[in-house]
Amino acid sequence: MDLDAIDLGLIDYERAWKLQDEYAAEIADGKRPPTLLLLEHPHVYTFGRKGQAENLLWDELKLKEKGVAVHWVDRGGDVTYHGPGQLVGYPLIPLTPLRSDRSQSDSFDLEDDSSKPVRSDYVGYVRKLEETLIAALMRLGVAAGRRSGLTGVWIQADVHSHCPRCKPQDREKPAKIAAIGVKVDARGITRHGFALNVNPDMDYWDGIIACGLSEPVVALADLLEPVPAMDVVKQAVVTAFENVFA
């Protein structure tokens, strides 16, 4: 795949959302190659199409105090957090048209337009995103994997048992290190993507029930010493992405 990887640095969520729309249209028209946007966001909670308001635990006063924006967006899944120290990736790539069951997962969605054909193996696409992140983490020295029936990338309990931030009871459970929530638009271009926890302020997960699951969340900073630089993590992700999607 001829991939254009673009590093946007720290960028507002709404601005990045608009860029996805602009670039996806260009890709669909053949004016831009498949693109991977890599970035960080200011503090924000985003709710997908399956989002439930009760999974937001902080009130408006607390949100203002912590400087957190809230957006309801057109990806699949429930609520997640984005913020500085977390690597967000938005792959914008065309998928091969393929009729598929819309109900296969809550964490990815197709454009809701029954007048147009359902396109693409989006479940297979999400599995490839998981494979990409697992491979990138392996390059960084962290073993990770999937969990049956769930979307995202997880660290086994015996790996993060030394995590000083994690509650003792949570060290006995798998912990989520990367979240995935995507959309495939009516022209077959992917939107949204993944969020990999590198060294974010983990206190912000206290404000939500992430992805509607009461499971522990972990970051590379909990697992590696020293913490790899963000540029190193980005390169690992780009290399893994190019290999998996070759």
Give the location of each predicted region.
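Short conserved catalytic/interaction loops centered on acidic-Pro-aromatic/His motifs
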Residues: 142-147, 191-192, 203-208, 246
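A structural signal for short, well-ordered beta-strand segments
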Residues: 89-91, 151, 180-182, 194-198, ...
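Non-catalytic surface loops within mature trypsin-like serine protease
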Residues: 95-97, 157, 184-186, 198-200
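C-terminal accessory segment of soluble enzyme catalytic cores
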Residues: 183-184, 197-246
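Residues forming well-ordered secondary-structure scaffolds
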Residues: 124, 128-132, 148, 175-177, ...
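N-terminal lobe of the biotin/lipoate ligase/transferase fold
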Residues: 1-174
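Short, conserved beta-strand/beta-arch hydrophobic-aromatic motifs that form part
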Residues: 57-59, 177-198
